[in-house]
A protein has these predicted regions:
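His/Asp/Glu-enriched, well-ordered alpha-helical/loop segment
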Residues: 1-75
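C-terminal cap of metal-dependent C-N hydrolases
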Residues: 55, 66-112
Length: 112
């Protein structure tokens, strides 16, 4: 088979004046357009953002392993399928082991 990935640099520019750079949102759109129904196919959508993209870029140090750069994005989701289906926002991200962003989860307030 052919290795495929999902990505874009067309965000908030003259050609595409919309978007938020969310690869999870792009994978969800891809799944909707292709009418993806099965969890295995949703997991493939997630793989197109992660290991399939790394393979296309020929990244030898991709993945969580001793000695690798520790690049990771953390989602509040039980599975990759849930992250795609529910368009979950990242809670934190790390580049070379250093935290680069954090998003606090929403908090419901009591009515006054």
């Amino acid at each position: 088979g052919v290795n495929c990935s999902l990505s874009s640099n067309n965000v908030l520019n003259p050609a595409t004046p919309y978007g938020d750079c969310s690869l999870i949102r792009m994978a969800n759109l891809h799944a909707n357009v292709l009418q993806v129904r099965h969890p295995k196919a949703l997991r493939e959508c997630f793989a197109m953002l992660t290991e399939r993209s790394a393979r296309l870029l020929n990244l030898k140090d991709y993945g969580l392993a001793v000695g690798n750069p520790a690049d990771i994005v953390v989602f509040d989701a039980q599975t990759p399928e849930q992250a795609i289906a529910e368009i979950r926002n990242p809670l934190a991200a790390f580049k070379r082991g250093r935290q680069t962003m954090v998003r606090q989860p929403p908090r419901l307030m009591r009515p006054s």
